[in-house]
Amino acid sequence: MKIPFTKYQGLGNDFILIDNRHSPEPLITAEMAVAMCDRHFGIGADGVIFALPGQAETDYTMRIFNSDGSEPEMCGNGIRCLAQFIARLEANNAIGRTYRIHTLAGTIIPRLEANEQVTVDMGPPQLLGSEIPTTLVKGSEKVLAVPLEVEGKDWLVTCVSMGNPHCVTFVGDLASIPLETIGPKFEHHPVFPQRTNVEFVEVIAPDYMKMRVWERGAGITLACGTGACAVVVAALLTGKCDRRCTVELPGGCLQIHWSQTDNRVYMTGPAKAVFEGIYPI
């Protein structure tokens, strides 16, 4: 079997996009996705995204396998790439075009903008311990600057779910964080029963922050859209930033707005096609 695909990237967070509109189940298995994502023996990517038929009054369904074969609820950079991929499939990239996309995190609505930008309505953040989920606090409590012991040190963490779990820590010197070694310690900490994404953040100004991310199931990546959203929510809740903020990641910048009017988080950033190909299974 030969699988046509298009490689996309959003701020260096890269994905293999597959046209799966004719079937409600992914064309390939999680194990096959791992092989495709291998950067030495495969195509190379942080994940494989499938454009499946819509359900529950949506236009499309998004499924994604991470590079380790796990399946996350949603991916912010990935859904921007999916929106551009759908526009290419439909041969309609009109500015302002929106799609209702079913994900495991609920319905997400991306909108095409000029210059290959996509704005995504990421929905409202979830803040309770039971929603993250985490056992760090009671299920009815929020996790705001709560100590978490990792590697013998107490880190003040704020937890947010953007449909997937995030553990945010604010630091004074982002470059000093040994992300490759400490990231997996946070991800697999026993207080996170479904594991967690991990963000370390340095606040530069109330409207500008820098972050590095260890993604659940993917490790260090150049960008994480849901992570950037979670960072702005966490920073605002702890008095560190404005509702509109630029978040700088290793791969570039995202514009994040946590609306006071409707409590929803909006993310704007690029998504670009890299190349097309056919992968033999």
From Swiss-Prot:
Substrate binds at residues 13, 66, 76-77, 164, 197, 215-216, 225-226. The active site is at residues 75, 224. One of its GO terms (biological process) is lysine biosynthetic process via diaminopimelate. Homodimer. This is Diaminopimelate epimerase. Catalyzes the stereoinversion of LL-2,6-diaminopimelate (L,L-DAP) to meso-diaminopimelate (meso-DAP), a precursor of L-lysine and an essential component of the bacterial peptidoglycan. InterPro entries: DAP_epimerase_AS, DAP_epimerase_DapF.
